[in-house]
UniProtKB/Swiss-Prot annotation:
Keywords: Autophagy, Endoplasmic reticulum, ER-Golgi transport, Membrane, Protein transport, Transport. The gene is sec16. It holds the Pfam family Sec16. Residues 378-391, 399-409 have a biased composition (Acidic residues). Residues 539-559, 692-702, 766-781 have a biased composition (Pro residues). Transmembrane segments: none annotated. It comes from Aspergillus clavatus (strain ATCC 1007 / CBS 513.65 / DSM 816 / NCTC 3887 / NRRL 1 / QM 1276 / 107). Residues 596-607, 660-674, 853-868, 1484-1495, 1775-1785 have a biased composition (Low complexity). It is a peripheral membrane protein. Residues 273-290, 322-360, 413-428, 454-466, 1434-1443, 1531-1541, 1563-1572, 1587-1599 have a biased composition (Polar residues). This is COPII coat assembly protein sec16. It comes from the Eukaryota. Belongs to the SEC16 family. It is found in: Endoplasmic reticulum membrane. CDD domains: ACE1-Sec16-like.
Amino acid sequence: MTQVEGLSTWNPAFRPEDNESIITNNLAQLVLDPESRPAEVSPVDVHTSPFGDDADVENETHVLESPLPSEPQDAPAPVATDSDPSQNADPITELKDVLEQPRHIDGNDSSIHPDDTQVAENVAEYVSTQPEDDKEQANGLHLGNTVAEGMSAEHDKDEHTSGLHLGNSVAEASHFSAPEEFSGVETSGNGLHFRAVKGDTSWIDGDEVEEDKDAMPHGEISNDRPGFWGNLGNDGRDNEDDFFDQLKTQTKPIYVPPETESRFEEGVPLLDNSPQTPVEQAQRGDNQLDNVFAGDEDDEGDFFNEIQKSTPEEGPFHITRKSTTQVLSTLDTTPDSPFSETSPTAQDFNQILADTSAQNETKEPSDADLAARWQAELSDDAEETMPPEDDLAARWQAELDDDDDDLLLDEASTANNDQEAAQLNQDHNAGFAASLQSPFGTPENPARPKAQPISYTPHQPSTSDLLQGIPAQAPVPQPHNAPTSNYFTAQAPPNPVTTRAESFAERSKEGYKSPYDLPEDLARPRRPVVSKQVIPQPGNLPPPPPRSSSIPAPSPQPSKAPAGVLGTSPKQPVAAVTPKNFYEELPLPPPRPKSRPASSGRYTPNPTSAPPPAPLSVPQSIPAPANPYASIPLAPKSAGDLQSPPELHQPEKLDPYSSLLAPAALGAPVVPGAQSRYSPKPPGLQAGTKPLPSPRYSPAPPASTVVAGAPPPRNRYASQPSSISGPGAVLPFQPRTSSPLAHHEKISYHPPGVSEERRRSEPAAGLPPPSHAQPFQPPVIPESQGPVDAGIHENVQPSVTQPNSPPRNPYAPSAYVNEFAKRVAPVQNDLPSIGTQNVAYAPPVGESPFVPPRRSQTQSPSQQLLSPRLSLPPIDPLQRPASVHGATSPTKTVNPYAPAQVSLHNRALSQSLDFIPPTDGQQLDPLERWKGAPIVKFGFGGIVTSCFPKHIPRYSAGQAAPMIKSCPGEIKICPLNDRLPPAESIVQYPGPLKNKSKKKDLLAWLSSKIAAFENEGDPSFDPTQPDITKRHEEKILLWKIVRFLVEHDGALEGSAEAQKSLRSVMFPHLQQSTTDQVPGDSFIPAATPQAIDASARSDAADSHSIESLRDSLVLGEREKAVWAAVDNRLWGHAMIIASTMDRSVWKQVVQEFVRREVRSTTSRTESLAAFYEILAGNVEESIDELVPPSARAGLQMISKVDGQGPAKNTLDGLESWRETLGLVLSNRSPDDQRALLALGQLLLSYGRTEAAHICFIVSRAAVFGGIDDPQANIVLLGVDHHRLASSAPLHNDDSILLTEAYEYATSVLAGSPMNTLPYLLAFKLIHAWSLADQGRKSEAQQYCDAIAAALKAATKPSGYHNPHLFYGVDELSARLRQTASDAGSSWITRPSMEKVSGSMWAKFNSFVAGEESDAASTGSGKAEEIGPFAKVSGTPTVSRSPSVSDIYGSYPMGGAQSAPNTGASRYHPVNQYALSSSPEQLRGRSSLDSQRSSSYGFPPPQRRGSQEPSTPVEMNIYQGMPTYGSPSAAGYQSTPPQTSYMPLAPVEEDSAAYSPPDPQPAPSQTLDNVSPYQPAHYAPESFGQPFETNDASATSQFEQGGYMPPSSGGGYEPPFVEVNPASASDDVEDESNEGAKPKKKSFMDEDDDDDMAARAAAIQKAERARRDREADEAFRKAAEADAQKPPPTTAKKGWFTGWFGGKKEENNSGGGPIRAKLGEENSFYYDKELKKWVNKKDPGSSTPARGTPPPPRGSAPPSRTASGTGGPPPPAVGTPPLAALGAGSRPSSSAGVPPRLTSSPAPSALGAPPPIPRSVSTSATLPTPPDGSAGAPPRPATSLSYASSIDDLLGAPQARKGPAARGKKKGRYVDVMAK
């Protein structure tokens, strides 16, 4: 057909001579008025030639007289007789079929028969192609239009097609009784299956029916009507009966139409509107209806006879059109002009029509029966006689009324409706032709078996079936090109966009090769009988695949595939609908208020430009054009998948998912809208019963004429797409696709015409768009795609990009994406058929493996076309809802996100194949690990080892399917970064931060992080963190504050520029001009309460108040005056007076002022009020102004000041924290830091961690400490350590690095000599491990080195420098050394200049210093470092030579951090870094336990014998010590064998740092175990008794059970180079008096060890005498030689010449002693009396030393020099008490409590000064007998050193020298060899 105009101007159903409205009304009345029988109408008077006014009246007469013009002569259609049980028994069903078939044309106008539509279209087309018959054509078109007008008088709104509306209206008429026969002509030429019904036609004609009702008992059309219908109803019921009888009996056309009419009749086969299942109608005894239209032929015999050349046959009346071959053979015109006058086919039709005129008379006997049946079926009384049908009719009428309120409107709108109807008819014809393939839309074709309409025609569900929740979604009409039109999809669009009528030739592109090329339609019987299918539960059957007419009807899986055609079993592709009773075909409408399926356009998208799409289950025999997407494996779940958006009526905004979200309302059958009897409206469209694929989503691809921009009106049913409710029920009533493959092919084809609103409404279904992003695929138009598809693509292109489509899912396997890209039509995204969408979310029950992604962006086509969001790729298969993965689609049974995207076949096999079980017992494994499973191991250094099992199929005889043998797969090792590439930032963190050179890099990194935080936007909403957005902003501010600190070298203030910069950071919104304003101007709004409380203004001039105030002051009652001023709001007076009074009064006055004046304002004055409180000194109470205590207590207080009650949330004051902070920073006051701390605590209590930390930083009074420190305010910036649900936040790299940056700013940049955060070293180690795990081993090694350096450099080790930390650093370093470096894996490291130069200088220095021979002589050089295991850390040497700075030497002492701590806690760390120690660290170890493994589980630190503590002090100096792991004061002590907790005597330095003011004894020890040695700050009186005597000490030692060497304080220490004469004299004295005076009892001399002590003393004495003699002799010789020689010349040389030019003679003296180099002049001489060398320049050296005697000769010196801790001198010598020494050497760490000593004499141990926390030896002070008697130095632990070892005697060369005062102890050993 050419253009819509043709249809609008001529319609074969209309009399050309009659006015459109008149003809339409008459025709409608005739069709609807069973009483107006064509047989009774005078043949000539009534009808004029449809082709012109001058046409033969005879033709018209014959048309009316002919019972029912059948197909061309060669395809005669026998007249249905009453005898035909199927026909007579079911005339209503036939009528309903006729009525509903047009629905396919008009989205909702189901009353239009497809044949009618085709008739209209063919006639219009023919007329347009017959210029000589322009007038006739125009008249004919007028006839069609007027008929449509008459029909759509009620359907004025939506049902505008001629003929279509007749049927539709008939279906809708609740009073429409079942007709006995068809009255009138059943013309398929223009879709005018005008089956005159014996019922009131008021529902169609409205006015006209009323006019004729007077003459007709049942509203028959009056014979008075002019024109075509004038005489049809002259005789009332009799005429109608005659007419029907004629229809039944007439075998030949009553009238032979002229050639022109014959041509139109020839066109009838072309216009097979059979989407309506004319077979079904025919099978149902539709000849009654056919007769109704046969009677019409009497008036329009020429035209209708041409169209219906069927010859009546006995038996059931069937209108069998010519076979395609016959039609083509007789037709010599092109498809565009099928009705050529010269064509033999036209002549045949004319002849047949002429013959049928006589037949009309023969059928009259059955007309009465038909009329009776019509009356019974269609009359209002029918409701009583036929309850189900009656209800259906009533509901049908209600639904129609509801949907089409204007359905019964005036005929004035019928013209427009006719045009639309014609267009829709064309659409339906296209769709129906494909499905029915019958040239006629005639309901019955005798050639077609009646019983087979089930198989041929889509199952016409019973009313109960229809009400079972099947959404009455008429398939979206497809464009003319729709590959396969569907009975159901072809529904007249309610508001069709004026589209030109298209010829069948055009439709051939979509599947029509010619108007007659539908032989499959004749084979309707082939279609399996479809029994009424109760709508399966959604769980039982998946929703039908998307109705894509372009998709060949899938052979639906019986259980899964939804019936392609409504009423068709899923396995029946045939489109024929089983003829049901009238009510079954007319689905009962659900509650009228819900949706009106009968509505012309709401229910089905308006296929304005193209014929409606064919239903999914179009008979496969129909040559449906190949669906371009049919090959796509995507199984469209909803027939609406390929709907023509322009053709679609824009449905009401309904929940697109409602149909699928809720299981199809199985309980209540849904009455399909008149428009789509196969897509019954879901009952009421309840949430749970949303219609599944609705007609408007029918897959009809829009013709190229489809205008994407003009979305059809929303179909409230169509807008309800698939639901996620699971496998949708198979909808036998809903033909959703003509392609049998559509059930199994996943198709995302989306007609662009669907309104955008539908897209918006879909989300309402509760299906949030899938989180996964949809892969982008460029649109690809399949080759099979017909013109319609092309048009669709054209329309779709603008909407190729769909913003609604979520971003591609990066995790979706590429294989899956590619697969969809290959098989998904490009239009999918643009034209998402709602039908498809409807079903899309209900995957078949069997498709459990795939859980369809939440439907995303499956908007209605119109939405996609109109939506501005159409910016995403057209092919977005994952975007499709589950429709992309059709429930019944076997092609996609696996999760699309499964990484291994194997082929479909492989997937199927892998899921079904069995494994070969092992026979070795592994088959009993309940976990079935023998089947294999992927194994992934994350190794050190960022290495990932993976192994995936191999499944090898094994075939065996007798088995069709193989079995799987699981074998280990290949082991792969790859860097973690290859699998999970880290999100690399532009700027790398420059850590570790060692020096100021890193400042620039650090600032760049901080800036990049801040920018990243700002760009990432607000984090997703977390209900557990309602303030997540605020916290995000505060986090950014915290980072900015740290950056500010770095920029300004850790200073927050100090310059105006710095403060200005800080304000700009904290208040970026403030104007720069505010700096020039009065302070606080920026907060003026909060400080201007003038407008409030005008009744009592402050400082009001009240003379009486002033006088009273003056009187009080005169009397000296200032306080009374103050409060009087306050009461009278004389704030100025009150404050002035209060300023002179006690500060408490001032605070109260200000507080009152704030409460009454500041807080009473309505503006946000919390910050100002808090600031005033701070200024007033109410520091702690200032936060109450932000959040009142009542609010913090959870109470809501009502203010009586403003009288408004709780007008706002009391917690809103928290939002003023920033303003408060700004006020404080800009106006510093003495105690404002306390206020800031309080503010921070307040914020922290409410979870505002970042804001709290900002306040802490700014306050400069916050405590940074370990997590175990209860007083620590901050552990890591941004982490609330008080509310840690896990330790994960403590491992956050950002927090660690930010805290490190803060430390860097406040220490390195600020010039602090030490790191301010010693506890942070442990977190740095955590970060180093994290770097190693990421494969950044070089950076991790740098951190290890930095940590080790910090530990070595710490002169005052912190308690956090615990063994855990040392061991962790050592372990990580060792592992890093063992692994290949980042640069390469070579064993030989590449040398660098730094390494080379460093090694050279090191060797040079060692050579100059004479240390180069140490390695060679001792073999302790680097030799062992060679080889692959050189860097493998092994067990440290048992007796390592101690080093003052050695980390291993230092960490055992675990020195507590010294801090001049004024905190309230006695264990408060010095720098407010609370030390921590585990309980294990408090455990002491006896010397016997020194070799036992550490309680920490790693090798214990190598301790020197001098370290071994003596009897542990019986007190817990560190009670309450944090458990972070800091060692006890005694350092790392051996665990006593007997007790689990027995702290030994702490090292002096540690005890000094940590001794609490009032220590308590350890619970496990008795006072007897108290060590005579007391730390500097130890308060002995806490024990309540003086130190024990020697016996007590001995007893305690015995009780301990461990061997403790005797302690003389610091143990044995090698002598200094500077020989102290006093020491020598002491030695002499001791030696001379050795025998006389009793030996000082040492630890070894106590009790049981008397004999041992005696032997040791004897040995020592003998050894000492020997050494003295040797030394004296050697030195004497050397001195004499020196005296004889001049001073060595080398002494006068410079250091360089001294190094290289000096003579080494003195060093060549074999085994002689090495002469000490004492300078240019030897000032030493040997004093024989004193028996030692004396310095002549030191007069005091000649005085005898009164120190303790040397240790027994038997005791070997300690392995390490303990020069830092000389043994304490006996108290008798008057050695200053330890407290004094400790105070001078180290600050007290006690909380403000000065060290105290007991009144008892200080033990000799107190004489030892506090050790320098440098080496373990310094902290290993051993107790001496409390009596002060000098005892032998303690014998070193035998396990750690050898007494006879010269190395032990000499000790480390770097041993530090002790104070000169302590040198006297060592004066005895002046042997230079010691140095």
